[in-house]
Amino acid sequence: MSSYDVIEYWNKRDNPNSKNPNERNTLKHISFVKENIRLNDKILDYGPGIGRILPAYTENNKVTGYDVSSKYKERLLETAKQRKIELNLIIDKAILTEFSFNNNEFDAVVSISVLLHQPPKDIVNIMCELARVATKVVIVSWHNPTIPYDSSDVRPDDSKFCFNHDYKEICKENNLKIDSWQYDNEAKQIYFVYRHD
């Protein structure tokens, strides 16, 4: 992969989030999501991948998954079935910075370890659209305040593309209100909830 293509990246990535630190972090992610959704919430899971966040949801939640890759579709649907979660999965192979959902169609958008993979040219539109379609947006993302914003963390083998976005500034400049903000220095992850102001 000579340049970064989000869809190609996910179609080629095997066993995402399978290393030990990610297993430990997943429990923190699930807990954070549970703290920020209600029993009967209608949820948009933006980038559900293999379904590692599904344990945060209950049978009563109405969950729509939105992903750009079908690589993990069967694994995701099987996990949802095992957890008795009715999941409406939308696979859209075009990178959309404008969604077809209605304003406030969802009670919450949940997006865990997804925004960090969105290129700087798309991040503002994506964050604004997520806030448009739900009353609140629940995010966990890689964040390293010691490196320049909108730079990427790229290994020589091109197996990882992570962008360090200035989420506070994006929210400020786009009338998005941050309701909670927590930083995990050890994991270099930000946990935050935002909405339209």
Outline where the language-model segments fall:
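Class I (Rossmann-like) S-adenosyl-L-methionine-dependent methyltransferase catalytic domain
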Residues: 1-40, 46-98, 118-125, 129, ...
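Structured loop/turn residues at beta-strand edges in well-structured enzyme cores
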Residues: 38, 104, 132-133
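Short amphipathic alpha-helix with an adjacent loop that forms part of the alpha/beta core around
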Residues: 98-104
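Acidic donor-binding loop of glycosyltransferase active sites
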Residues: 107
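A conserved beta-strand element that flanks and buttresses the S-adenosyl-L-methionine
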Residues: 110
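Short catalytic micro-motifs in class I SAM-dependent methyltransferases
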Residues: 113-117
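Short glycine-dipeptide loop
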Residues: 134-138
